[in-house]
Amino acid sequence: MAAHRIRVTNNNNVLPRCKSEGTLIDIDEGVTEASLVDVKVPSPSALRLAPSTSFGTAREVVAIKDYCPSSFTTLKFSKGDHLYVLDTSGGEWWYAHNNREMGYIPSTYVQPINYRNSSLSDSGMIDNLGDCSEEGAKELDLLGEWTGVCLKPSLPYDNNNPFSMLSSTNPFLNGSMDDVLDQNSNEKPNQCNSMDLLFFDLPSAPISTTSNTKGYSISGFDGTSTSADLEALQMLRKDNPFFRSKRSYSLSELSTLQAQSNPPLPSSGFFTGLKAPSPEQFQNREDFRTAWLNHRKLARSCHDLESLGQNPGWGQTQPVETNIVCKLDSCGGAVQLPDTNISIHVPEGHVAVGDTQQISMKALLDPPLELNNDRCSTVSPVVEIKLSNMEIKSFITLEMKVSVMTRTESPMAEIVCVRSDCKEGPYSPVPQAYIYGDTIQVQLDNLEPCMYVAVVVQAKHVSFSSNVWNHMVKKVTLGLYGPKHIHPSFKTVVAIFGHDCAPKTLLVSEVGKQAKSAPPVSLQLWGKHQFVLSRPQDLQIGMYSNMSNYEVKANDQARVVRGFQIKLGKVSRLIYMISSRKADEISDFTLRVQVKDDQDCILAQFCVQTPQPPPKTGMRNNGQRRFLKKKEVDKIILSPLAITTKYPQFQERCITNLKFGKLIKTVIRQTKNQYLLEYKKGDIIALLSEEKIKLKGQLWTKEWYIGYYQGKIGLVHVKNVLVLGKVKPIYFCGPDLTTTMLMEQILKPCKFLTYIYASVRTILMENLGNWRAFADALSYVNLPLTYFCRAELDSEPERVASVLEKLKEDCLNMETKEKKSFQKELMMALLKMDCQGLVARLIMDFVLLTTAVEVAPRWRDLAEKLAHVSKQQMEAYEAPHRDKTGMVDSEAMWKPAYDFLLTWAAQIGDSYRDVIHELHMGLDRMKNPITKRWKHLTGTLILVNCLDLLRSSAFSPAPQDDFAI
């Protein structure tokens, strides 16, 4: 049927078929509203307008040079041709028609008609207007406010053009003509609003009219002048700074000058009163600088775009392209794009010995037009590869995963990797491409300094009734973006990608008069979902909240993504305004995103949990605030379990759950070690644990018991002890072991461990739910809260932090007679509160940091002993800490060591005993091990192995709910 209509149309010499997309419609047969519902884009017949009338809100331009298209989606034209631009959001490429067909045109090849008032040109200069008279300035102040003006000219093509009043069926029209002309009127007809898609850039001015006053003509699209035109011209202002200078201004400068002279429109957002300060409001520059920084911080935190610019429209949004830069030597290696499945493998000997090559990779999310048409469709981002050193000896391999499969029942398409030296093409297939399941490996030779590589599905044959989508199963990705914290009113963005590479952030910039003064806002990826899309079609994206307090505001057309956008592979974005009915009751909630096709069938849906609202800080005080210095306060979320915790009472009692042994050898050590016991043959020793610890002694590795001998706790060689049993011999020498004595003995090595105070503070604020119990355990008994801080605090975590700050001050006070160790006092208090898990976590953090500091210049040796880390991996650990000369300073060498130890400990597992034990053994295997001079890691190992014994002895049996976690 479609082919027959095309042939009839062509034989009658009426119109050729549109090359990019569209449905053929014969206007003479009559078009009803119902029949136009199925129209995806304007047909060529609908574009046969009179020369003096353009298509809806299209802007007329003239070609200044010839252009021959390189793909079917672009439009061919010659110098002097008149074109009508429908969409300018593409930047370098505009979407236009020439009364015969539609397609993309390069913006640099055309010039707007009457470009002195054109919204399409930002580089043209407006000359000689500064020389006009005062009367001319009155009539030519084209940028004045038109508030209250209602323009409804009678357009000559209203009755003849079926598309002029059917904006709901035409994705290229921003709205009905009445909506455009009566933008400021309070009484608007009940019609569908314009599609709130960031894929299109709405015109900056509501309408342009034609005036012959003083011989000047200003037109966006021609129409019949009415009395409203004259009323509008009488409202033009003469105090515009544009007319006060003799120089020429670009349209960008005009928008800035107009923003300075005209008061901005009132914002309809939640943060209505948030306005940038002006220098005139302050007496000195420093006060203005402080106020400006505070405003900027507040504006970025609330993420309300209307606070960044007074234009009530939504800003232009673009994804942050994922990129990485790495330098490799002759040993080769691998470079992977962060948060993607895209990597480059460089073989050994790729460059000469002593040379290096810098490799830069970037994922470009919007593919060029050449790669998406009826025959071809991209299934990966375009990967930009830049190489610095071209003196190479081998090829490199690009590996990436794709979310597509070709249909086995119709082998008419294949997955192809294409390459080009330019972003816009032309692209040619890469022969050395190998596919393994969903992974494709590409062998790149004939390397260039800059290359662009993409994976596409290409159909071998295309007919009028089928395209490449009929021969593949393709997945698209839906990403939901929003601010870091939710607020009573905020905006979210739903983005659709033609591949599985969704960026972690979206940058949002305000589009309007004050766009240049507004910094971009970064929206974070809340969640993403993949689903199979059988063909390019209109998708209805709905968003729903699971809480009645939050309302999602979006009209029906703002929920639609057009099929031709998906076909072109462009990133489509939808905006949803979410507001709270009760601004004082804000909490996180769940958003459900639902995708429906044009038949109202559900294709996919998924749920995303929103972030938390920003935490409330304590009362501000002009006095010194020693407990709110760190940024970690904003990250504290107190566990619900910690709030209801009842901390048990530490009991002073003798430890009875012990085994005893007889020493069968006398040991006197020449090199003293406070954690290795000295003993006499025939004496009795108490064994705190039957578990054997494998450590290196003076010469070789041995197995050890933890023993208690004559008031001292330490290690004893297993072969030197004959285990007797649990009955205490009568000739046992030394004092009985009590819980307090055990705690004092095992906490001795804590004072020699290195710690980061901010990290300790954060962990305690997150896990302690009772500042009173914490203060009592630190011997601050019955002291009021004002003893620790100067202001009353509403937050329990901040109260805990104030007690911790007081402990730190007392330990660092040099005037006190009794010297205290911060680490030991803290651990003792936590053990008295039965927070054994918290002690184990802090001890492991202290041990890893202390080891990194002690072993800093020799950390590579330790990494090789612990995990057999390769040279390339070691370089990767040091890369973030190199200075401008490419070297890691000796004083900063602990940083890569700490990064490695954290990664290694996470791979070992959750057992803090195993981590410390394996670390000790790894240090023992080093050449000239540091454990020979630094003995306190041995004491720490004794500590973590005695925690269970201490807890079972110091606390009476109680229900599990009464213990702290």
UniProtKB/Swiss-Prot annotation:
Keywords: Coated pit, Cytoplasmic vesicle, Endocytosis, Membrane, Nucleus, Repeat, SH3 domain. Residues 322-456 form the ZU5 domain. SUPFAM superfamilies: SH3-domain. GO terms for molecular function: GDP-dissociation inhibitor activity. GO terms for cellular component: clathrin-coated pit; clathrin-coated vesicle; cytoplasm; nucleus. It is found in: Membrane, Clathrin-coated pit; Cytoplasmic vesicle, Clathrin-coated vesicle; Nucleus. Residues 56-115, 656-726 form the SH3 domain. It comes from the Eukaryota. CDD domains: SH3_SH3BP4. The keyword Repeat applies. Its main location: membrane. Gene3D superfamilies: 2.60.220.30, SH3 Domains. One of its GO terms (biological process) is negative regulation of cell population proliferation. The SH3 domain mediates localization to the clathrin-coated pits and vesicles. Possible role in regulating endocytosis of the transferrin receptor at the plasma membrane. Alternatively, may function as a negative regulator of the amino acid-induced TOR signaling by inhibiting the formation of active Rag GTPase complexes. Preferentially binds inactive Rag GTPase complexes and prevents their interaction with the mTORC1 complex inhibiting its relocalization to lysosomes and its activation. Thereby, may indirectly regulate cell growth, proliferation and autophagy. Homodimer or homooligomer. This is SH3 domain-binding protein 4-A. It comes from Danio rerio (Zebrafish).
